[in-house]
Amino acid sequence: MIISASTDYRAAAQAKLPPFLFHYIDGGAYAEHTLRRNTEDLAGIALRQRILRNMSDLSLETSLFGEKLAMPVILGPVGLTGMYARRGEVQAAKAAAQKGIPFTLSTVSVCPIEEVAPAIDRPMWFQLYVLKDRGFMRNALERAKAAGVKTLVFTVDMPVPGARYRDAHSGMSGPNAAVRRMLQAVTHPQWAWDVGLCGKPHDLGNVSAYRGKPTSLEDYIGWLGTNFDPSISWKDLDWIREFWQGPMIIKGILDPEDAKDAVRFGADGIVVSNHGGRQLDGVLSTAHALPAIAEAVKGDITLLADSGIRSGLDVVRMIALGADGVLLGRAFAYALAAAGQAGVANLLELIDKEMRVAMTLIGAKTIADISADSLVQGLR
């Protein structure tokens, strides 16, 4: 398959992965309206083309939380990344470090903190869920700190798991799921060998380290699902803020009032996000939620965004809407599934090139030059 654009990796991933894994990363909640709107609404943002601006010294470099980035892109937390490629978290982290951007390890990664952190030459970020088992949360934070993690991404939009109907159809869950997954693996021999056999252990590395015994996909669906905490409130985050001395980012904000609460709480950053359309169907797309949040808190807190970003052009659009940087999820997972570390590295180069073309044609020499003035007003 020819990969000429960042968006080509989705089809390549579908050809490579067993259906239960492809549809797990590709799917969303309920009827997936928000999932579709994330990309559709972002694609509808019209950029304002400018000409004859002398764009010879263009730069994508930026700084977030005291860390220099080659471009305003972070590889965001994606659960079970190690099931898309052999030891997938390590491969993705290496590609990110090679490009000069951060990688964020998910709570529910296959590879544990202690395997990923030493594999790269820059501090990774770590994502943590709010769970009933506070002992696990403290253990994960202590281990992340010991591994040199400086930046914590705290996901707050998952007090309960989203209803992802596609998972039951694909074999990730539902009747006879284990048998269906095994049959799918047999019909995808390249994945079965490279990941299924050579990529073991297939457990939740961070959870296994805490529980002292191996975990499985059933634990991901079972133990983790019963551990999400619907009672969480801002006061429950106080001990984490006290414990974690580095930058703390609150991920999963869609409303300006919640963004203001994050500022009052003392968060260093927020991620405007609907969890990639995987939690509550029918909520605003990130592209439509971001401008009001930026108007409410821009300058008081670092603004990041995710959900629906598939290309360098999308990165430029999100920054014009008010973000200081973006997190990639599905986009890099597709590339990882298709071609491992090399696929992610190529994806990041494609995004770099796409950003440079877009910035040249809107007259923005630096990331700071991208603003609401870069958009055609009335078509946002």
Swiss-Prot record:
Catalyzed chemical reaction(s): (S)-lactate + A = pyruvate + AH2
EC category name: oxidoreductase
Known EC number: 1.1.-.-
InterPro entries: Aldolase_TIM (IPR013785), Alpha-hydoxy_acid_DH_FMN (IPR012133), FMN-dep_DH (IPR000262), FMN_HAD (IPR037396), FMN_hydac_DH_AS (IPR008259), LldD (IPR020920)
Protein's cellular compartments: Cell inner membrane
Membrane topology note: Peripheral membrane protein
GO cellular component terms listed in the entry, alphabetical order: plasma membrane
Chief site of localization: membrane
Record: residues binding FMN: 106, 127, 155, 251, 306-330
Coiled-coil region list: none
FMN hydroxy acid dehydrogenase domain boundaries: 1-380
Gene3D superfamilies associated with the record: Aldolase class I
Active-site residues from the entry: H275 (proton acceptor)
Cofactor: FMN
CDD domains hit by this protein: alpha_hydroxyacid_oxid_FMN (cd02809)
Reported function: Catalyzes the conversion of L-lactate to pyruvate. Is coupled to the respiratory chain.
Protein name per UniProt: L-lactate dehydrogenase
Organism from which the protein derives: Serratia proteamaculans (strain 568)
